[in-house]
């Protein structure tokens, strides 16, 4: 086994998809970390949850997750062919938490404020970045969701992982004030 995905039942956040990724030194820089990140989000999709890694992230964790979030969001925004997608739509499709989605869109410089609303605007730079991701994709280890046999754990309490609309507005308002 080259890497491991750990998720404990005792994590402090019900939206934490993963607590720790370990890739042994001999297998680092070979795509196993990103593979494990993708695997954790595929499990979140099966469970119909949004999630995020346990925070704070290490420097390497920030780089790995930031790269993964950027790649997937650009794939959805550019590759889906849909003209109108909201933050809620992106969270539903990717299983990313709203704050991770918004933060990544900001880092990619894709959020624009216009007439009292935020719009997702695809720049030429983002299209170029998407082309680079597509070129690298041929050599990456990918998760095939059809090969995952997983039965989600059902706890006694019910949570609504999609309760994000008010959080999205709050996050966007915070950025506007800064």
Where do the protein language model's features map onto the residues?
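Extended, composition-driven regions rather than compact fold-specific motifs
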Residues: 1-30, 35-178
